[in-house]
Amino acid sequence: MMIDKILKECSSPFYLYDEEKIKDKISFLNNLDLQFQRKFNFAVKANPNLAILNLIHRSGFGAEVVSAGELFKSLKAGFEPSDIIFDGPGKTEFDLKYAICLLYTSPSPRDKR
């Protein structure tokens, strides 16, 4: 069995995800999405694994982030700035400046200062 092989090859703890199950859950939510005409956003804090974020991005979801690190991961996974919601309490000055530089769009570079 594939899991037995993985267990023998890995000497440290690891997470094992079932991509098909994740896709099934995403498909279910996307069907609700169409029914209620809403777009889902994935809370990156729930699972910042880049492979999972890539899968979620390719499925049409947006990303909800609360820190510069989560924002970085979301952008690296392919989310467009317009598909990222940056909210939550306790943002540091660095988090805010980072988000402004990466998410704020303006025809004038002077506006970002």
Segments (PLM) and residue ranges:
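A charged N-terminal "starter" segment
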Residues: 1-103
